[in-house]
C-alpha cells in the first residue's frame, strides 16, 4: 500500500530541478524566500499582479521561546498581522538565518529569558552572533521587542533588554518602545499587539489574501491542539512511586498519568504542563495569620468564588518576589522591610530566602481579601520533561519529579507543584495537563545517527523517553549515556532499566558520576573530560549531543567541558572550539533542555 501511495507525495520536479531549487533556496534569507514565494506563485497564476513594493516589505516575527509562552504570543501577533492583510512570516529563532539579518526591514522579536539572565535555548546562536564582532550594521531595520520574564529572578526580562539595546547599537530603529512583562503578561501583550499592528498598517502596503506571502520552510508550525495551557485536559494519575532510597537526601517520584481519550500526542523531548493546586494546610496558615476565614467572596476571572478556592487554584503561594516584599512593606509600614525597598540587591535576596508565608509570619498584619490577592501573582502551570515515549507507553505520560523541600525557622517548606504531585495527588485522582511541544530537543531524523545523552538528577527523564523510542523503532544508532547524582546506592534513577538496555545492546556505553561517594566530588563534566578523545571521535562521526539539567549550574559546566575537550582533541583554541560547538547547535547536533 505504501508503494501505491508514494507517487502522490513526490514533487512535480525532476531530481535535477529539485537539486537546483534546494541549492538556490538554501542561500536565501527569510525575506528573500518570502519574496520568491510570492513571485513564483504569481508566475504560476498569471492572473493576479503582484505588488513588488509590498512584497519587499515583509514583516518577520521572530519567536525566541523556552517554555512556550513567547511562541504562543508570537503566533498571536502573526495571526493579527495576517488579519490586517500585511505580509508576514513567523520563524523560530533556532531556524532563523541570522547571518542574513541585515536584509530584514521590519523585525518583531518576542523573547523569553531563561533562568537568571540567559537567552532561551533556541536563541543562543542568534544572541551570540549579535554580540560578536561579526554582527553587521543594521541601519535598514525597524524593530520592536516584547520581553517575557519573571520578576522573582535578579535579571528580569534581561534578554529582551539585551536584544533591544544591541539592535539599537547596530543602527536599527525602534518601531515601538520595548515592553518587559512578568508572568501575568497577557494584558500587556494584548495592548502591544494592537499597537504594533496599528503602526505597521500606517507604514506598509496591505495586500489581499491571495497575495499574502508565506514561508513554508522555517515557519513555526501553528499546532491547534484540542487541549492547551488555557484549556487543559483532565487526566488521571495511575502510578506514583518513590525511586530514591529511604536514606537519600532527595525525594524523587516516578509518575504515570493516563491521557486516554484526550487525543494528545507527544514526542520524546516534549514537556507536560501541570496545573497544580496549593496545599490546604498552607492556605489555612496564611488565612489565620492575615485574619481571614477563607469564606470571603472574591472575583477571579469575572466569577465570584470563595477566597479559599482562589488561593488553592488561582494564585502562587510558594514563590516570593521583590515586588511582593515591596508592596507588603508599604502596607505594613514595617521599618525592616522598608529599609530593603531602596536596596534592590537586598530586596531580591530577602524575597529569594523568605517564602511569603514566613514573611507574613514574622510581620503579621490584617488584610482585606482584595489586598491579599493584589499582592499575589497568578498561579502558573509547571512544566516537566516527559520521561516516556508513546511508541512504548501509549496513552500515558511518565514524569520524574524531584520534591522541592527545605527548612526555614524550624519548619519544613515544600514547592507548590512538586509537593502536590508527590504528596497530595493520589492514584486515580484527576489532574489538569497539556502538552508543551519542544522542537528544540528532538532525536535525529536518521535513526542510524549516534546520540550522546548527558543528564544529572531528574535531567535523566527525557533520555528514558529517548531510549524507549529508539527501542520501539529499532533504531540502529549508537547510544551513550552520562549520568550524575549524589550516591550510587541511593540515587541511581531507573537503574534496572539502564542495566537492561546495556544487556540487550541498545545502550552502548554508560558513564556515571556520584558526587558524594568519595572525598573529591565528581560530576558529569569530569567524566566528559575523562572520555574526551572517544567523545571527540563520536562527534566527528556525526553524533548528536543532548544535555538536560539545571541551566545555571550543570548545563553551564557541561558546556564548558565540551568546549574544552573540543579544543584539546580538535586542536583548536578556545574561540575556535566555542565556534565549533555553536555550529553544532545551529545544525541541531547540540541540543539542551534546561530548567
Swiss-Prot record:
InterPro entries: CysJ, CysJ-like_FAD-binding, CysJ_Proteobact, FAD-bd_FR_type, Flavdoxin-like, Flavodoxin/NO_synth, Flavoprot_Pyr_Nucl_cyt_Rdtase, Flavoprotein-like_sf. Pathway: Sulfur metabolism; hydrogen sulfide biosynthesis; hydrogen sulfide from sulfite (NADPH route): step 1/1. Pfam families: FAD_binding_1, Flavodoxin_1, NAD_binding_1. It comes from Baumannia cicadellinicola subsp. Homalodisca coagulata. GO terms for biological process: cysteine biosynthetic process; hydrogen sulfide biosynthetic process; sulfate assimilation. Binds 1 FAD per subunit. This is Sulfite reductase [NADPH] flavoprotein alpha-component. HAMAP family: CysJ (MF_01541). FAD binds at residues 318, 352, 382-385, 400-402, 406, 415-418, 595.
Amino acid at each position: 500500500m505504501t508503494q501505491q501511495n508514494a507517487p502522490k507525495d513526490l514533487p512535480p520536479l525532476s531530481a535535477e530541478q529539485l537539486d537546483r531549487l534546494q541549492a538556490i533556496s538554501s542561500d536565501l534569507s527569510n525575506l528573500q524566500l518570502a519574496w520568491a514565494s510570492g513571485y513564483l506563485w504569481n508566475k504560476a497564476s498569471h492572473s493576479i499582479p503582484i505588488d513588488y513594493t509590498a512584497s519587499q516589505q515583509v514583516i518577520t516575527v521572530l519567536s525566541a521561546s523556552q517554555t512556550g509562552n513567547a511562541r504562543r504570543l508570537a503566533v498571536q501577533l502573526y495571526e493579527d498581522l495576517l488579519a490586517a492583510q500585511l505580509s508576514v512570516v513567523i520563524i523560530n529563532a533556532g531556524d532563523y538565518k541570522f547571518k542574513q539579518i541585515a536584509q530584514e526591514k521590519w523585525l518583531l522579536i518576542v523573547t523569553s529569558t531563561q533562568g537568571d539572565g540567559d537567552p532561551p535555548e533556541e536563541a543562543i546562536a542568534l544572541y551570540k552572533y549579535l554580540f560578536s564582532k561579526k554582527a553587521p550594521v543594521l541601519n535598514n531595520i525597524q524593530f520592536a521587542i516584547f520581553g517575557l520574564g519573571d520578576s522573582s529572578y535578579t535579571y528580569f526580562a534581561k534578554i529582551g533588554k539585551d536584544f533591544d539595546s544591541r539592535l539599537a547599537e547596530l543602527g536599527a530603529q525602534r518601531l515601538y518602545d520595548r515592553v518587559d512583562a512578568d508572568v501575568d503578561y497577557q494584558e500587556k501583550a494584548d495592548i502591544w499587539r494592537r499597537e504594533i499592528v496599528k503602526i505597521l498598517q500606517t507604514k506598509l502596503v496591505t495586500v489581499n489574501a491571495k497575495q499574502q506571502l508565506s514561508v513554508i520552510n522555517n515557519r513555526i508550525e501553528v499546532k491547534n491542539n484540542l487541549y492547551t495551557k488555557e484549556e487543559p485536559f483532565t487526566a488521571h494519575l495511575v502510578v506514583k512511586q518513590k525511586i530514591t532510597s529511604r536514606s537519600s537526601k532527595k525525594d524523587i517520584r516516578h509518575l504515570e498519568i493516563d491521557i486516554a481519550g484526550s487525543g494528545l500526542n507527544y514526542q520524546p523531548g516534549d514537556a507536560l504542563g501541570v496545573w497544580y493546586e496549593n496545599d490546604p494546610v498552607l492556605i489555612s496558615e496564611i488565612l489565620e495569620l492575615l485574619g481571614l476565614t477563607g469564606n470571603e467572596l472574591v472575583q477571579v476571572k469575572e466569577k465570584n468564588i470563595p477566597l479559599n478556592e482562589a488561593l488553592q487554584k488561582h494564585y502562587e503561594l510558594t514563590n516570593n518576589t521583590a515586588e511582593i516584599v515591596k508592596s507588603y512593606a508599604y502596607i505594613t509600614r514595617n521599618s525592616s522591610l522598608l529599609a530593603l525597598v531602596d536596596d534592590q540587591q537586598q530586596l531580591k535576596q530577602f524575597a529569594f530566602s523568605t517564602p511569603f508565608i514566613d514573611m507574613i509570619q514574622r510581620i503579621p498584619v490584617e488584610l482585606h481579601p482584595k489586598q491579599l490577592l493584589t499582592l499575589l501573582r497568578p498561579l502558573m502551570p509547571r512544566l516537566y520533561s516527559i520521561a516516556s515515549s508513546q511508541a512504548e507507553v501509549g496513552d500515558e505520560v511518565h514524569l520524574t519529579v524531584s520534591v522541592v523541600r527545605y527548612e526555614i525557622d524550624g519548619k519544613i517548606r515544600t514547592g507548590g507543584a512538586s509537593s502536590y504531585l508527590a504528596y497530595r495527588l493520589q492514584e486515580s485522582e484527576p489532574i489538569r495537563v497539556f502538552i508543551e511541544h519542544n522542537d528544540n530537543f528532538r532525536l535525529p531524523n536518521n535513526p542510524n545517527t549516534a546520540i550522546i545523552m548527558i543528564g544529572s538528577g531528574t535531567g535523566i527523564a527525557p533520555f528514558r523517553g529517548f531510549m524507549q523510542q529508539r527501542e520501539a523503532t529499532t533504531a540502529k544508532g549508537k547510544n551513550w549515556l552520562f549520568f550524575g547524582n549524589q550516591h550510587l546506592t541511593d540515587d541511581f534513577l531507573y537503574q534496572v532499566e539502564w542495566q537492561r538496555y546495556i544487556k540487550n545492546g541498545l545502550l552502548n556505553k554508560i558513564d556515571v558520576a556520584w558526587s558524594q561517594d568519595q572525598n573529591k566530588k565528581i560530576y558529569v563534566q569530569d567524566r566528559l573530560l575523562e572520555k574526551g578523545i572517544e567523545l571527540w571521535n563520536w562527534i566527528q562521526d556525526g553524533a548528536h549531543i543532548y544535555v538536560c539539567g539545571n541551566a545555571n549550574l550543570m548545563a553551564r559546566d557541561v558546556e564548558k567541558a565540551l568546549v574544552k575537550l573540543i579544543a584539546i582533541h580538535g586542536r583548536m583554541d578556545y574561540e575556535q572550539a566555542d565556534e565549533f560547538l555553536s555550529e553544532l547547535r545551529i545544525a541541531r547536533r547540540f541540543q539542551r533542555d534546561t530548567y
